[in-house]
A protein has these predicted regions:
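Short alpha-helical segment of the dimerization/phosphotransfer core of two-component systems
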Residues: 47-55
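Conserved micro-motifs of the catalytic ATP-binding
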Residues: 67-72, 111-114
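Conserved catalytic submotifs in the C-terminal HATPase_c
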Residues: 75-76, 100-110
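Short beta-strand/loop element within the Bergerat-fold HATPase_c
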Residues: 137-147
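Acidic ATP/Mg2+-coordinating residue in the GHKL
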Residues: 155
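Short conserved segment of the HATPase_c
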Residues: 160-173
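Glycine-rich ATP-binding loops of the HATPase_c
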Residues: 194-211
Length: 223
């Protein structure tokens, strides 16, 4: 076994263990009184465990994408069900932090083709970031705009720093000395989006400030 295979196997094993840990902590949060001294600490532990777990999922997916090994599998997805499953993933953190989570959907029920696991991972990660940096509001919207599915995550925090807005994340970034960010999440999102194609259109991502809530906005377009 070469070192790369060993590292990938180890990351996969750690990811599975973290998934079990987060499930236990989610159950603990539901049973703990909100005013209990351990409630905020359990919430923070859950957030950090989920953040690391998401990073490992992204690393494994990127390894497979770079090696042309990722089993890209676009399927027809009912957006209303997809939205409810994403909300279920983030709800324990939202409730623990007292965040107002808003959801905006097309009035017409719609289905869309995309790789469920890839898109679920990047949207969930974006919501986690919004919950971390918002003041008290986060909005998830899924609307068809210009014949593309537009998934937006908006918050009312301070927004993205100028340096991050100036970077397009075409390649993995080093650690930012000011923010501590590696840019992994945005790089993963961009690569995952670009796998989705329909005729001449390709999936894309961008970040901006302002948006619908005045803070940071993450926007994903899927053709």
């Amino acid at each position: 076994m070469d070192i790369t295979t060993f590292l990938v196997s180890s990351i996969h094993d750690m990811k599975n263990s973290l998934s079990v840990m987060t499930a236990y902590m989610q159950s603990a949060l539901l049973e703990l009184p909100v005013d209990a001294a351990s409630h905020s600490m359990t919430y923070q532990a859950l957030y950090e465990a989920q953040r690391v777990n998401h990073n490992m999922i992204q690393l494994l997916a990127l390894y497979k994408i770079h090696g042309d090994m990722y089993p890209f599998d676009p399927v027809e997805v009912e957006l209303a069900i997809f939205q409810s499953e994403i909300i279920a993933r983030i709800q324990p953190l939202v409730a623990a932090k007292g965040i107002a989570l808003e959801v905006v959907m097309d009035e017409i029920e719609r289905n869309w083709y995309f790789d469920y696991e890839l898109i679920a991972a990047l949207v969930t990660q974006s919501l986690h970031n919004a919950v971390k940096y918002t003041h008290d509001r986060v909005r998830l919207s899924m609307l068809v705009v210009d014949e593309q599915l537009e998934i937006r995550v908006d918050d009312n925090g301070e927004g993205f720093p100028p340096l991050m807005l100036a970077q397009s994340f075409p390649a993995p970034q080093g650690i930012n000395g000011n923010t501590g960010s590696t840019g992994l999440g945005l790089y993963f999102a961009a690569r995952a989006a670009k796998l989705h194609r329909n005729r001449s259109r390709t999936g894309s991502t961008r970040i901006e400030n302002g948006g619908t809530l005045g803070g940071g906005s993450f926007i994903l377009h899927l053709p």
